[in-house]
Swiss-Prot record:
This is Protein lin-37 homolog. It comes from Bos taurus (Bovine). Residues 36-55 have a biased composition (Basic and acidic residues). It comes from the Eukaryota. Residues 163-172 have a biased composition (Pro residues).
Amino acid sequence: MFPVKVKVEKSELEMAKARNQLDAVLQCLLEKSHMDRERLDEEPGKTSLDTHNKDCSITATGKRPSARFPHQRRKKRREMDEGLAEGGPQRSNTYVIKLFDRSVDLAQFSENTPLYPICRAWMRNSPTVRERERSPSSPLPPLPEDEEGSEVTNSKSRDVYKLPPPTAPGPPGDACRSRIPSPLQPETQGTPDDEPSEPEPSPSTLIYRNMQRWKRIRQRWKEASHRNQLRYSESMKILREMYERQ
């Protein structure tokens, strides 16, 4: 009789426990519907996702919620409303994504935001911290037309935003000639018909003649490059003075 009595007591305890869990679930559903209706009446634009998560966590324990639970939820909702009011309307909308164990709130950026601020916020890994909007850098002040000529003379005492243009290479269409020298004409030695022709030169003689010609061509290229650099002498002077000021 003793084992049978223990089995009966165990079944009664399980039945009482199941009834308590059922009562807790029903009571929680009633309070949830009441709070959802109250929230919809007060704040029609907000959802009750947080309330649902809290209710589910309570029902999972199988205990009856306390009598002060609605009061705590109202207090929590009041604190959230105050936080939203202090943070401004921009904190109400969030779109947080998680990528490689780091999170970023994309709702704070617009379609024209560069990629670098988004990467910087992702590296910070703080979705609740908003990226401060930086004012665009001021453009360079326009240079008046009457000051372009005096820019070279006053380069020591003022900032330089524009270098003077190079001098004209010469007549129109000679810009290419200032960089490329004129070709060197080959040396031809004509022989009269009545004189016998010279024998063919040896390879060493040909190499010597070609080396002399190559040297003259290289010297002509050096002279053309030097003449072209002289066109930028004013700009080089300004850059040299800026370097010496440092």
